[in-house]
UniProtKB/Swiss-Prot annotation:
<comment type="similarity">
    <text>Belongs to the complex I 49 kDa subunit family.</text>
</comment>
<dbReference type="GO" id="GO:0050136">
    <property type="term" value="F:NADH:ubiquinone reductase (non-electrogenic) activity"/>
</dbReference>
<dbReference type="InterPro" id="IPR001135">
    <property type="entry name" value="NADH_Q_OxRdtase_suD"/>
</dbReference>
<dbReference type="InterPro" id="IPR022885">
    <property type="entry name" value="NDH1_su_D/H"/>
</dbReference>
<dbReference type="Pfam" id="PF00346">
    <property type="entry name" value="Complex1_49kDa"/>
</dbReference>
<dbReference type="InterPro" id="IPR029014">
    <property type="entry name" value="NiFe-Hase_large"/>
</dbReference>
<dbReference type="GO" id="GO:0051287">
    <property type="term" value="F:NAD binding"/>
</dbReference>
<dbReference type="GO" id="GO:0005886">
    <property type="term" value="C:plasma membrane"/>
</dbReference>
<comment type="function">
    <text>NDH-1 shuttles electrons from NADH, via FMN and iron-sulfur (Fe-S) centers, to quinones in the respiratory chain. The immediate electron acceptor for the enzyme in this species is believed to be ubiquinone. Couples the redox reaction to proton translocation (for every two electrons transferred, four hydrogen ions are translocated across the cytoplasmic membrane), and thus conserves the redox energy in a proton gradient.</text>
</comment>
<keyword id="KW-0520">NAD</keyword>
<keyword id="KW-0997">Cell inner membrane</keyword>
<protein>
    <recommendedName>
        <fullName>NADH-quinone oxidoreductase subunit D</fullName>
        <ecNumber>7.1.1.-</ecNumber>
    </recommendedName>
</protein>
<dbReference type="GO" id="GO:0048038">
    <property type="term" value="F:quinone binding"/>
</dbReference>
<keyword id="KW-0830">Ubiquinone</keyword>
<keyword id="KW-0813">Transport</keyword>
<keyword id="KW-0874">Quinone</keyword>
<keyword id="KW-1278">Translocase</keyword>
Amino acid sequence: MAEIKNYTLNFGPQHPAAHGVLRLVLELDGEVIQRADPHIGLLHRATEKLAESKTFIQSVPYMDRLDYVSMMVNEHGYVLAIEKLLGIEVPERAQYIRVLFDEITRVLNHLMWIGAHALDVGAMAVFLYAFREREDLMDVYEAVSGARMHAAYYRPGGVYRDLPDAMPQYKASKIRNEKALAKMNEARSGSVLDFIDDFFTRFPKCVDEYETLLTDNRIWKQRLVGIGVVSPERALQMGLTGPMLRGSGIAWDLRKKQPYEVYDRMDFDVPVGVNGDCYDRYLVRVEEMRQSIRIAKQCIEWLRKNPGPVMTDNHKVAPPSRVGMKTNMEDLIHHFKLFTEGFHVPEGEAYAAVEHPKGEFGIYLVSDGANKPYRLKIRAPGFAHLASLDEMARGHMIADAVTIIGTQDIVFGEIDR
């Protein structure tokens, strides 16, 4: 009788469903996965080491490039750690703006996830729908920071600037007639806050559209139900966080359990799954988008009523105003010193964690009293999730490995960092 042998297959790093640079070495028995060995490091850029040779403020843009789908939430963890060490108070308005943009980023992340996950599984349409909404939110990023993705908007002590009074508008071109232009600029006639408000008023309908396409879709359920099941106990043991943990039925959300900024004033629910499979994790993330709408609406309401400063008044940390810089020599010198030498952070260590769209994103910061971090450790949620891939994929088909990678919502910027 012929000897039965398992064969080994390389999945990625060029595979379209590998989400970037994932290389999986799969050991297969026929089409059934016996072992999945993820090989990481193909996107390693030594972020932690680079941060040691840059001033505290110069490392903010590095944070955007970790999980490059959830840019501002990465910055949030980093600036929180610096603020802990400095012991400075962030103005209330800046805290509300941060919470608002955390939720905008959460929606951006989940839109990317639902589009890519559905595309991997074979549902093309949702991808196009999701990117239609992402476009509007990217424009909000651009309005406040000047960049569509890598914003560097959060700064130690607050945010870069207050929300602008005008939303950038589409300009006339060869391909846009007056009628189309007027329709596109309809929601853009007011302030950025008006535009965000309008977006979150329209957005529940969009989420309903995604659910119409997927939630009760027979093929979608066949591909997701019962795949990649993780029990609550194993989820905790493997260090899963965020929707991966909540999908297994554990209501752990840092916004509720360890509130930072003004999350303790927000009224929202934490969605949890029942079965711990890919379908439950899908439902959790869709519901998270709906909860983000609730939080964003509360922030918008507060921001409309309460103007105020968006940066701390501690001049050792906060740069002078642009107007002051152009008229006052001292302000110019102060600005130059702040952006060349940077500020010195007291000796000590701090850990700050935020509820990132993918899980718990933590920054462990050690300062030796200099103007640069002595050590910066990044706790990326995706790292623990990828480590659990082997256990989740065992006994499933190759096609299911694609579903499991999609449900983990993996981005390699933060895993390889």
